[in-house]
């Protein structure tokens, strides 16, 4: 397994709309394993392929405290949404930035597992939020882009300042 490089906002590659996965081969299995390793190392709970510059519709997720409930969503699609909730989100592509985002409270998602087998899942709570957040990535949207223009500008300024300090 290998650690992958996580793209950081405002990298334009994060705005790429991912293409469907069509081939379920050993290379895909390796990509999935590498994404889990990268997500765990970065202490994340979800990672979309777009975030590691792999522009296919693939998400890995594990919201458990024990880190033992791996979930893989390939070609995911939200088919139902219900309710509304506000949750403070963070993102591995926007390190150190957290803000409240409005999302559906419950979702139903259709996807394929790592072997290509179709499944449906109804989710609420943190799982529903995480699914929506990661699917945004597959559609080229970063969570901060769901905030007001003023907040987006403040975040960009903060990130630029941080980048200068790290040089």
Curated annotation (Swiss-Prot):
Cofactor info, note text: Binds 1 Fe(2+) ion.
Cofactor(s), by name: Fe(2+)
Any GO BP annotation: translation
Catalytic activity reported: N-terminal N-formyl-L-methionyl-[peptide] + H2O = N-terminal L-methionyl-[peptide] + formate
EC numbers for this chain: 3.5.1.88
SUPFAM superfamilies: Peptide deformylase
Active site (UniProt): 134
Broad enzyme group: hydrolase
Keywords in alphabetical order: Hydrolase, Iron, Metal-binding, Protein biosynthesis
Binding-site positions, Fe cation: 91, 133, 137
InterPro entries: Peptide_deformylase (IPR023635), Peptide_deformylase_sf (IPR036821)
Single Gene Ontology MF annotation: peptide deformylase activity
Reported function: Removes the formyl group from the N-terminal Met of newly synthesized proteins. Requires at least a dipeptide for an efficient rate of reaction. N-terminal L-methionine is a prerequisite for activity but the enzyme has broad specificity at other positions.
Family: Belongs to the polypeptide deformylase family.
Protein name: Peptide deformylase
Organism: Chromobacterium violaceum (strain ATCC 12472 / DSM 30191 / JCM 1249 / CCUG 213 / NBRC 12614 / NCIMB 9131 / NCTC 9757 / MK)
């Amino acid at each position: 397994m290998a650690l992958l490089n996580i793209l950081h906002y405002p990298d334009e590659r994060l705005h790429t709309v991912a293409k469907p996965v069509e081939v379920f081969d050993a290379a895909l299995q390796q990509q999935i394993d590498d994404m889990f390793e990268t997500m765990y190392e970065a202490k994340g709970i979800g990672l979309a392929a777009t975030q590691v510059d792999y522009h296919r519709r693939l998400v890995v997720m594990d919201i458990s405290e024990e880190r033992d409930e791996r979930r893989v969503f390939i070609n995911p699609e939200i088919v139902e949404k219900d309710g509304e909730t506000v949750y403070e989100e963070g993102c591995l592509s926007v390190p150190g930035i957290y803000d409240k985002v409005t999302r559906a409270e419950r979702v139903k998602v259709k996807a394929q597992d790592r072997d290509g087998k179709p499944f449906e899942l109804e989710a609420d709570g943190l799982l529903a939020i995480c699914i929506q957040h990661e699917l945004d990535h597959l559609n080229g949207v970063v969570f901060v882009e769901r905030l007001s223009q003023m907040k987006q500008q403040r975040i960009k300024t903060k990130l630029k300042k941080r980048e200068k300090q790290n040089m």
